[in-house]
Amino acid sequence: MSAQNGYEWQQTERDVWTRTCLGHEAAASFNENIAYGHTELSVTATFRVHHPASSGIAGTDQEQEDLVARVRDAWIRTRYLRPEVAVEMTTHTDASIPQAFTYRVLRDEVSLRRWVDQTMAVVRLGEPGAESLEEVCAYTYNRALPTPGKQSMLYLVLPRLADEKDRNAHFVWNVSHALADGGSISELYNVLLQAMIDASPSTDGSVYIPSDQELDVLPLLPRSVVAAYRQQHKPSAADEEAAAETARDNLRLIQAKMNESLALQPVTNWTTRKHETICIRRDIEADEARELIKFGKHIKSGVTYLASAATVLATAETFPERKASSTGALMGMVRNARRWLSTEPVEGATGNRTPLGSDAVFLWIPVDTQKSLEPSFDGVPELVSVAARIRSELNKHLVSPHCISSYPVVAEFAQGALTNHWAEIEGANRSAHTPNAEELSKIIGPQAPGFSSVGALQVHSRFEPASPSARASGLWLERTDSAHRGRQVNASPWISMLMIDGKIKLQLGFDAKFHDADKMEQWMQRTYEWLLVCAAAASSSVGTVAPISARL
């Protein structure tokens, strides 16, 4: 097998497919292994199955039993329609050995039942450990995936017993970042929820058995964006070297600018603290979101750039100890390679599904730090100016698909850096003497702010059965909410944003070993209030008002 073919799926034995990870999927899997599950995602969806009145099961125990059976069968079917949920990953931390994926085709009921037992859990609100959806989510993002090979895990969260006001159920999809990003979350949920409403649970307790067509998983197995790019764009050696040099330039930028950058300041006593992921969320309701979008259009800037600029300015005021000596900010920004890839298989490809397309680049953004950067109408011109700079700098990294050629180089560097970094962290944690502040700052120093725009989450709000008779009966599924959170086991928290149902949702996950919750709350609140100021500026005369953060 050639090295290149090793990055495509190969059948190594009957019903077993394997391939070597390539690019950021390799780095993501390795990062999860060495950092106790760092970046594993917990993505929620809230829904209700509406049964026809003639069924007579609404509000009964039978309704809940039907729901569990539907979800079980839909989860099995999704195993074949979106096979990444059942892909197993290597779990080693040896950077010299490639990360790899394995997918096993299961055909019999015994194997499928065993897989469901390993990867699906049913909990009910009100039970111990499940007082709220947030508590269930917190459980999932405060431990690494427990499934064999880090396969996805699906939690079905049932409503409280006898709660007549809220009969909604919830999903928490817990998944490796090596196999999902903001762009592919929607695709998974659309498949899973449709499979739910299409399900016809058996009355004898047997489970769904995939059809022969569904068992043909090769066209649907997840490809690396690097492999898909190489096949579609056929980069030359010069393209690959230019991309690698651009990536090295980006690493040099971080080294050159960190000392003069606005930054998050980790705690100095982190060796005495335990890892704990805390997720902070803020929602901008639909009316204010419309005003924010309106403001962005007026100044010819997208909400992504306004929100990333708000993140920078919020950093300055939350960590003022860096402000006086800073001339700007290193800013981490996410981009997505799928913008350059065909959504249909190109000639010679068995499939073109690439559930992980995102990566990050760092930008240098000059900021006038000699003024107040608290949220206020007076500060809007500075925010708009910073947003324009971010857009201009990011666009330099969006000009050519050949940047994808750099992903294997960056991933290899990342795995080496992570190995060294975690050796230093664990060494400091185990040290017989307490390292001094200077020693600790060499291991965990100031952190550049980062922003990840997931974009619009295109999960449908209504699902009807494919069967005409089932549809005619009045059976349907309503999806009413969705959100995302993630496990954080490092010192570099990022703020992320998505839009769904007209709302804009901000999320900040951080590791309490390295950051104080109060500081993270302030950082998120300032970012959020900057966006509210922009929304208000869309329909108000912009005058001088006191900084909103004065009311924190």
From Swiss-Prot:
EC number: 2.-.-.-
Molecular function as annotated in GO: acyltransferase activity
Statement on biotechnological application from the UniProt entry: MELs not only have high potential as eco-friendly biosurfactants due to their excellent surface activity, but also have attracted considerable recent interest because of thei runique properties, including self-assembly, anti-tumor and cell differentiation induction activities, and moisturizing and hair-repairing properties.
Keywords (A to Z) from UniProt: Acyltransferase, Transferase
Role: Acyl-CoA-dependent acyltransferase; part of the gene cluster that mediates the biosynthesis of mannosylerythritol lipids (MELs), surface-active substances that enhance the availability of water-insoluble substrates.
Family membership: Belongs to the trichothecene O-acetyltransferase family.
Protein name per UniProt: Acyl-CoA-dependent acyltransferase MAC1
Source species: Pseudozyma antarctica (strain T-34)
